[in-house]
Amino acid sequence: MKTIFYLAFFYSAFSFAQVYEFLSTKNNKTISHRIILDKEYLIETQFIKEPAEFILTRGGYYKKKGKTYNIELEFNSNFENDGFTIIDLRKGKSWLKSQNKPIDLNGKWLMAGRVTELGERRRDITGPRKTMKFLIDGYFQWVAFNTETFQFFGSGGGFYTAEKGIYTENIEFFSRNNNSVGRILPFKYKVQDSDWYHKGKSSKGKPMHEIWTKRSNLISNK
């Protein structure tokens, strides 16, 4: 199913890494809309900041024609309700572009494995079940999904810093547990070749040592 959304935003020169935000109101609640994109991929997320409430997220590879982004969705957390697999986002007048500067970790990263007492345990990143983390100019979002079944397993995001070997996430929305919003999660990190290692504790307080790899290393079907 395809639908067209005439979303308004303040237009500025297109660049390959952007974050936009705007607000809307529904049932007396203020909804934050965030869109993060690079030269080929776009994620739209809607959430309420106070009190914290996750609404939806959806994203995929896009093509741009004029003022319209045509997105072939890889995931849609609201799929069971709306059935959308393709959407068009058209420029209007109310998005505000983030002025944050690019950070070295910018990009799409796939969960590639974990480091255990026995060494690295890698997972197959070519299958349909993926966990992806999208980092753009100090904003992050992770999404777990299945590209074949369109199953959505969860998502969370917010903003981050990466300085002197410490990567820190500030959670602004979390589909699985609104109580996680506001938490600050620091990790030790390093980038080695095209892998990003980070070590710390999850939002549940459990130790973790993860390996992420750039999605550009995987030939995708678009």
Where are these regions (language model features)?
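Bacterial Sec-dependent N-terminal signal peptides
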Residues: 1-21
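Lipid interaction determinants
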Residues: 15-155, 168-222
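Beta-propeller blade signature
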Residues: 157-162
